[in-house]
Amino acid sequence: MELKMNLQLFAQKKGTGSSKNGRDSISKRLGVKRHGGQQVNAGNIIVRQRGTKFHPGENVGIGKDDTLFAKADGVVTFEQVGKKKKRVCVYPEPAMAE
């Protein structure tokens, strides 16, 4: 009579499991960089955005990633156009008369 034994050994300690959490993407630093009433120089970034939450107005350009920037020196103003649309303009400061 032959006796076959099937022996299976288990681990003495449970291995440490890996978590599926613990990752996060880096922030994109979006938002308004220069607020209404602030002085800007040509080329300064006014708003970093995804899509056109704010539309470019007078003396404001738009980059390929929808970033709004000043085309001229002046003061930033945020304007409401209609019910939904917001526009950013840069108006040059009037020269002081002496």
Swiss-Prot record:
Query: Propeptide residue numbers?
Result: 1-10
Which ranges of the sequence are coiled-coil?
none
| Any single Pfam family the record assigns to this protein | Ribosomal_L27
| Disulfide bond residue pairs | none
Cross-referenced SUPFAM superfamilies: Ribosomal L27 protein-like
Name one cellular component (GO) term.
cytosolic large ribosomal subunit
Note whether DNA-binding occurs among the keywords: no
Q: How is it modified after translation?
A: The N-terminus is cleaved by ribosomal processing cysteine protease Prp.
Disordered, as annotated region: 11-30
A Gene Ontology biological process noted in the UniProt record is: translation
Superkingdom in the source lineage? Bacteria
Q: Which UniProt keyword terms apply here?
A: Ribonucleoprotein, Ribosomal protein
Signal peptide range equals: none
Q: Does the keyword Ribosomal protein apply?
A: yes
Q: Which GO terms describe its molecular function?
A: structural constituent of ribosome
Per the record, the similarity remark reads: Belongs to the bacterial ribosomal protein bL27 family.
> What name does this protein carry?
Large ribosomal subunit protein bL27
